[in-house]
């Protein structure tokens, strides 16, 4: 949607209260199909989110998503391989949920589900995935290459059964599920994460509670979005700011540690995805390790 169309759709007299923001998702759309889809570039992903946030806040709210039933798993799509870990998944979730707008969490996202491993096209159910396979083959890709494309981009990745425990079929059913269960269910499931205080699931609970807390719900709901450190490679950072509070959300998507100069002193560290270690903060300096995210209140 073009920026000048936003008032018509989500303004005070617009058609809708909100619309989903797919600006980052379209970055991996291919010109002719999935087979020529470009790899995600962090700088373009960051720029797309920032642009959407700055344009939308003039008129209303968009609904922010990492994934849904029509998209592959966000952890596999938006994170480089080295960041597809519990810490990296928590980092991605923090950035998404604390943007200005209405946050959505899709089933399985809160435990860090990633794309499944598909061994043949017969395992897919989605008709569009099968169409994309044939498009890739007609473009000259081998059977294995076309399968890899579909494995990466298919929405069936988000439609595998919810992983409740490490029992057969992930505890979802004793019958035959419509799709095979993601093989990760033995390591990634609700039951195990319920018992781990540092799990992705329990982190998401902290994150949601923080956004809804009496102290911060106003600034996270109505506060202005202001990007920061855009000149730093691998850093996604922004302020949520109103008349009474200035919150900095800073995430390091890069492989190497990064140091940022803060504009003011730190009043409080509200959240970090490194539970075993406090965020490395000095009076006016923030040091972030790879895949680390912090939520700070500044003076």
Name each model feature, range by range.
Residues 1-299:
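Active-site and adjacent substrate-binding regions of carbohydrate-active enzymes
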């Amino acid at each position: 949607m073009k920026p000048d169309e936003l008032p018509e759709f989500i303004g005070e007299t617009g058609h809708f209260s909100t619309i989903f923001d797919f600006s980052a998702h379209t970055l991996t759309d291919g010109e002719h199909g999935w087979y020529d889809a470009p790899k995600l570039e962090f700088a373009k992903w960051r720029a797309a989110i920032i642009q959407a946030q700055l344009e939308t806040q003039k008129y209303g709210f968009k609904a922010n998503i990492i994934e849904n039933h029509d998209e592959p798993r966000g952890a596999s799509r938006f994170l480089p391989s080295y960041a597809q870990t519990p810490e990296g998944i928590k980092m991605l979730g923090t950035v998404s949920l604390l943007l200005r707008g209405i946050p959505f969490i899709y089933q399985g996202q809160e435990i860090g589900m990633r794309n499944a491993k598909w061994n043949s096209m017969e395992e897919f159910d989605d008709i569009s995935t099968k169409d994309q396979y044939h498009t890739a083959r007609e473009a000259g890709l081998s059977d294995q290459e076309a399968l890899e494309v579909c494995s990466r981009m298919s929405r069936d990745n988000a439609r595998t059964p919810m992983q409740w425990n490490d029992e057969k079929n992930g505890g979802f059913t004793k019958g035959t599920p419509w799709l095979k269960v993601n093989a990760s269910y033995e390591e990634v499931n609700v039951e195990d994460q319920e018992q781990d205080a540092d799990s992705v699931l329990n982190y998401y609970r902290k994150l949601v509670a923080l956004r809804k807390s009496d102290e911060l719900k106003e600034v996270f709901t109505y506060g202005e979005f202001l990007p920061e450190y855009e000149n730093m490679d691998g850093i996604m950072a922004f302020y949520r700011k109103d008349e009474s509070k200035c919150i900095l959300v800073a995430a390091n998507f890069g492989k190497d540690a990064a140091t940022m100069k803060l504009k003011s002193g730190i009043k409080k560290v509200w959240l970090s995805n490194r539970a075993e270690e406090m965020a490395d903060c000095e009076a006016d300096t923030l040091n972030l390790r790879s895949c680390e995210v912090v939520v700070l209140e500044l003076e």
